[in-house]
Amino acid sequence: MQIQWYPGHMTKARRAMQEDLKLVDLVMELTDARAPLAGRNPDIDKLAAGKARMIFLKKADLADDQATLAWMDYFRKKGITPIRLDARKTNFKKAVVDGVKIACQEKIERDRRKGILNRPIRAMVVGIPNVGKSTFINSLAGKTAAKTGNKPGVTRGNQWIKIDKQLELLDTPGILWPKFDDEAIGMKLACVGSISDEVLNMQEIAYHLLSYGKANYNQLFEARYGAVPQPDDERDNEIVLWMENIARQRGCLKRGAETDFDKVSAQITDDFRSGRIGKVSLEVPKQV
């Protein structure tokens, strides 16, 4: 799947980010826990060199718990403080503030030695489009502090948001690279919904999810969709046959009982994104 989604304002955002980084102590990066590496901009490590770092694994309640633990260890070894974000937990703000203290411990101690007490940490929130940066800030601020939306790239200008006496955030639009050199990265982002569905082939996404699920989470996928059919003819594709079975189960049929692949593909993709299949991660450190 060749995907290129890079609006002009993103180029400006990258330049602005380089300038804004001079103002902050901490870079707070958001990524989807189901595809943490695919959901990171490859330039961030270079741009944020010398800054304290945090990474928030969003939607961790939808990801494989063991994979998430492995990712947290992976990022710790890189000097990045990882925080697992679970939509079901209510202590969100405390988890973030506690994590900031850990990530910025050196700066806080350095300020204390200079006699500077309680100076707020200034942080920048970064991430690819549609990862939920504005919602993240709103949850911290306890009010609608930044414009939010459910489509990639809705946030535009930069805003300073005062969270409390100890933390101020700069909401910066996410940056997605101009093209995906590795098609697998684009597919993972498409699966988790980080790219606008309008530019995607939903049948490819559903096919990939079923193929990946069969290989890595067969029990979960078969519990949801029934057993993978065994082709009578070696020329038949078992994943396509599986999609046809699912379509019949769900009533995703056109006139003449023909399979409506678009409709069933949308349902399979939505099942994954909403967690109805179960806890599934699309990559783990050993795979990348």
Which residue ranges define each predicted feature?
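Glycine-rich phosphate-binding P-loop
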Residues: 122-142, 146, 172
